[in-house]
């Protein structure tokens, strides 16, 4: 069995980790960074850039550079959160045939799952480069408050990326694993994980207990907001800058895609700077131009102003915290430790607010950017059987139920129920001689079904004619360890049954996923070809440079025919380099190597004779040098001497 990697698939940044023995290791990507921006750019020539390279070209390719895609995954186009993002994002969000929110790049619609798969593929490659072996299995994290559709969509993204997703694990739970595993305190400890990331907010109350030498992590409650995070904080700064610039210059930057992309970068930078300083300058020369000429933007932003701009966003995190504490059946005083996760928690005001709410200083010994990936890697080690001293008991974040008479939501599994879990209840028909029942499945806390998230529906047919209330229909709910729901209905009288795995009333079909997996494999093959072509081209260009240089130095020692042969081979090679045929380039490279063989022989012979002459001169001059040797302080050369320590 290969290694199971842990991936934190974040809204703003992603991170990958593995276990080396019992020590977690966060893996640096090809740029040497421990986190990778969750940004994907689609180039005109079909190349896909992921991470820092995609971020660098965002200003000049805004419409085809996708970020914060996690906010769309598993969502319908008509959802109010998606509609809000349509007006804010420089890229186009479109409705897919199944009603999902997809994106449009270079005239082609692609799903949020495919974009997420590109990010996951980069994480997979990062791990493979480090381990030197293929990676096929992963534990991927999601916000605790993700619903069933969002979890399923994340799992699908993993499959498209060529990963078997062994487990979907909640981000706060993963962070608790990373925090609690090496703690030696005896007795049960209750911790609160406050997770404010790039696009989502979660709060979980978790109990860590020692049970016969085994660390047990039991989630008591969870709550949150899947559309609240650092991206919203950035947007508040952007809106403020736009308003200020309009006041000063009379120009509205909100319609300028290029300017917006520069503003986004500047807003994120300013926000980070204000975590360490009281004031920052936002300086963007040539931000736009009008009839009077170019316009420059220079605005001062203080920490106090930023706090005022985002006050309402910070307030929005408090209600879920209070609900989670209440649902866990604990008081604030019962909580031993508060852990901060997610880059946005570096903001001093967030830390102040959390301290005020929980009455204690948040822990500083948890890396908010890496803890989630580390926890996922620990869970991967547990699932692979390499670790047996950890037990994780997670919960379902929202209640699950079915629609019954009058549009009422009848809850089958209540929120914060430990998973995996099963529950069955018997229902009957609403009308005489009813031949079939439609089971409509919902997720949420509202009493009326239509106010909750519709997850899917199916029919149980062939019910024998009978008076209303007579048939006995058993509906069963089964949530697996990934938090994904399977629903069944059975007519107790006839034994007829029907089952579905909830894939939301949209999501990707199996055929679509298979097609996307194939496309991804093709893409991978294309990428490999591209890399091979670039390598062949680089080798050829280096060869041309080297031969040309040698020809300049030793060409006069060659016969005319030999020299012409080399020059012809160089011309042929330069012609081949103008095209994109790898085989032709390699063939011309071989021809050039053969043609320049005589040149190499001349160079070698010349070097040999030079060395021999040098050796003779050195031997002849040694005696004379010794005879004249005497101290000559005025000829001393100052030099730096370094001690080379061995071992």
UniProtKB/Swiss-Prot annotation:
Stretches with biased composition (Basic and acidic residues): 627-647
DNA-binding listed as a keyword: no
Keywords: ATP-binding, Chaperone, Nucleotide-binding, Phosphoprotein, Stress response
Any one Gene Ontology molecular-function term assigned to this protein's record: unfolded protein binding
CDD domains: ASKHA_NBD_HSP70_DnaK-like
Superkingdom, natural source: Bacteria
Pfam families linked: HSP70
Phosphothreonine PTM sites in chain numbering: 200
Region: Disordered, residue numbers: 607-647
Induction: By stress conditions e.g. heat shock.
Family (UniProt): Belongs to the heat shock protein 70 family.
Function: Acts as a chaperone.
PANTHER family cross-referenced by the UniProt entry: HEAT SHOCK PROTEIN 70KDA
Protein's name in the database: Chaperone protein DnaK
């Amino acid at each position: 069995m290969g290694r199971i990697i842990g991936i934190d698939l974040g809204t703003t940044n992603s991170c990958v980790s593995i276990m080396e023995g019992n020590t977690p290791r966060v893996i640096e990507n090809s740029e040497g960074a421990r986190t990778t921006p969750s940004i994907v750019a689609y180039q005109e020539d079909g190349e896909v850039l992921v991470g820092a390279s995609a971020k660098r070209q965002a200003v000049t390719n805004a419409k085809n550079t996708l970020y914060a895609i996690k906010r769309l995954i598993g969502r319908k186009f008509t959802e109010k959160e998606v509609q809000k993002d349509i007006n804010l994002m420089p890229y186009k969000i479109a409705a897919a045939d199944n009603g999902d929110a997809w994106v449009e790049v270079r005239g082609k619609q692609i799903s949020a799952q495919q974009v997420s798969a590109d990010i996951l593929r980069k994480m997979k490659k990062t791990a493979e480069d480090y381990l030197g072996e293929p990676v096929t299995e992963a534990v991927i994290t999601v916000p605790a408050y993700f619903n069933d559709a969002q979890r399923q969509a994340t799992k699908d993204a993993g499959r498209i990326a060529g990963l078997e997703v062994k487990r979907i694990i909640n981000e706060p739970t993963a962070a608790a694993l990373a925090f609690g595993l090496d703690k030696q305190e005896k007795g049960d400890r209750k911790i609160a994980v406050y997770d404010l990331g790039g696009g989502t907010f979660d709060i979980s109350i978790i109990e860590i207990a020692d049970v016969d030498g085994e660390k047990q992590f039991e989630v008591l409650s969870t709550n949150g907001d899947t559309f609240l995070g650092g991206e919203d904080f950035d947007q508040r700064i952007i809106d403020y800058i736009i308003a200020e610039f309009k006041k000063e210059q009379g120009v509205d930057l909100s319609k300028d895609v290029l300017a917006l992309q520069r503003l986004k970068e500047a807003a994120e930078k300013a926000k980070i700077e204000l975590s360490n300083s009281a004031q920052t300058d936002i300086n963007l020369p040539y931000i736009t131009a009008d009839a009077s000429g170019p316009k420059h933007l220079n605005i001062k932003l203080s920490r106090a102003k930023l706090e005022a701009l985002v006050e309402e966003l910070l307030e929005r995190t408090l209600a879920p915290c209070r609900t989670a504490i209440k649902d866990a059946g604990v008081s604030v005083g019962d909580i031993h430790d508060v852990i901060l996760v997610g880059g946005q928690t570096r903001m001093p005001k967030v830390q102040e607010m959390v301290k005020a709410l929980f009455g204690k200083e948040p822990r500083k010994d948890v890396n908010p950017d890496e803890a989630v990936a580390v926890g996922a890697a620990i869970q991967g080690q547990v699932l692979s059987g390499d670790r047996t001293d950890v037990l994780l008991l997670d919960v379902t974040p929202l209640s699950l139920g079915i629609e019954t008479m009058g549009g009422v939501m009848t809850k089958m599994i209540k929120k914060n129920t430990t998973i995996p879990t099963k529950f069955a209840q018997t229902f009957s028909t609403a009308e005489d001689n009813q031949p079939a029942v439609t089971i409509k499945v919902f997720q949420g806390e509202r009493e009326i079904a239509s106010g909750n998230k519709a997850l899917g529906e199916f029919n149980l047919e062939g019910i024998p004619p009978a008076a209303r209330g007579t048939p006995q229909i058993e509906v069963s709910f089964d949530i697996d360890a990934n938090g994904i729901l399977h629903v069944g209905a059975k007519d107790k009288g006839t034994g007829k049954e029907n089952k579905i795995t909830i894939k939301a009333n949209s999501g990707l079909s199996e055929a679509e996923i298979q097609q996307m997996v194939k496309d991804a494999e093709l893409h991978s093959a294309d990428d490999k070809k591209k890399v091979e072509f670039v390598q062949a081209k680089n080798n050829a260009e280096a060869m041309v440079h080297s031969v040309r240089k040698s020809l300049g130095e030793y060409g006069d020692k060659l016969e005319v025919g030999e020299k012409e042969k080399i020059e012809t081979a160089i011309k042929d090679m330069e012609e081949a380099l103008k095209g994109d045929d790898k085989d032709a380039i390699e063939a011309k490279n071989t021809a050039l190597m053969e043609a320049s063989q005589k040149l190499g022989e001349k160079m070698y012979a010349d070097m040999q004779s030079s060395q021999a002459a040098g050796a003779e001169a050195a031997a002849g001059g040694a005696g004379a040098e010794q005879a004249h040797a005497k101290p000559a302080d005025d000829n001393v050369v100052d030099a730096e001497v370094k001690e080379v320590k061995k071992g």
